Amino acid sequence: MRGVFVTGTDTDVGKTMVSAWLAQHWRADYWKPIQTGSTEGTDFESVARLAPAARIHPSAVVLPAPLSPHEAARREKTRIDLSSLVPPVTDRPLVVEGAGGIMVPINEVALMIDLMERLSLPAVVVARSGLGTINHTLMTLEMLRRRRVPLLGVVMNGQKNPANRQAIEHFGGVRVLAEIQPLPAVTAATIAGLPPPTFTCPGDP
């Protein structure tokens, strides 16, 4: 399967924007296996709006509360089964977006990193560019490597910070794939106006 798993060092670091950017420029399919906080709108709706070239697949699990998947499911008196999270079949690149960071619980025994390990797609880690990002990013990279999740690289989101980029590349032994500076507004036009990725979608067609 040709694709990437877009994860982040935290929630609200820009995973959906980066997913839309990749999906638009690669003309890819987009799938978010678990969507929480659906009462506030869904990320697949956002990507459909931001990346008109993308083909959107519905989430396998949609939960109303804006909480971690395990807690959002508990409040609905249900349980998320990892085996039910099966990627869509497609002949296009697939951009998969996680919920929260890699250690967020999916149920009482499984974490997001377990799903990443199961899917075995190369990870794109979205990180903030500012203070605190070195620690969060290096810990995320360390856990991904411990679990042998393939790692494509890091996308930094925010004002450029050369010192933080250098530290992440040096200590993390990873490539910073892109630096996306703050946009005046996040729209289909501004996403399309971003420079295209300088890296190709990995995997077999």
UniProtKB/Swiss-Prot annotation:
Binding sites annotated in the UniProt record for ATP: 97-100
Substrates-to-products reaction catalysed: (7R,8S)-7,8-diammoniononanoate + CO2 + ATP = (4R,5S)-dethiobiotin + ADP + phosphate + 3 H(+)
A Pfam family recorded for this sequence: AAA_26
Ligase found in the keyword field: yes
Residues given in the record as substrate binding sites: 36
Keywords, sorted A to Z: ATP-binding, Biotin biosynthesis, Cytoplasm, Ligase, Magnesium, Metal-binding, Nucleotide-binding
EC number: 6.3.3.3
SUPFAM superfamilies (UniProt xref): P-loop containing nucleoside triphosphate hydrolases
Essential cofactor(s): Mg(2+)
GO terms under biological process: biotin biosynthetic process
Predominant subcellular localization, coarse grouping: cytoplasm
Annotated active site: 32
Subcellular location: Cytoplasm
Pathway: Cofactor biosynthesis; biotin biosynthesis; biotin from 7,8-diaminononanoate: step 1/2
Residues annotated as binding Mg(2+): 16, 97
InterPro entries found in the cross-reference section: DTB_synth_BioD, P-loop_NTPase
One of the record's GO cellular component terms: cytoplasm
One Gene Ontology molecular-function label: ATP binding
Assembly and binders: Homodimer.
Function (record text): Catalyzes a mechanistically unusual reaction, the ATP-dependent insertion of CO2 between the N7 and N8 nitrogen atoms of 7,8-diaminopelargonic acid (DAPA, also called 7,8-diammoniononanoate) to form a ureido ring.
Family: Belongs to the dethiobiotin synthetase family.
Stored NCBIfam families: bioD
Protein name in UniProt: ATP-dependent dethiobiotin synthetase BioD
Organism, as annotated: Paramagnetospirillum magneticum (strain ATCC 700264 / AMB-1)
Gene: bioD
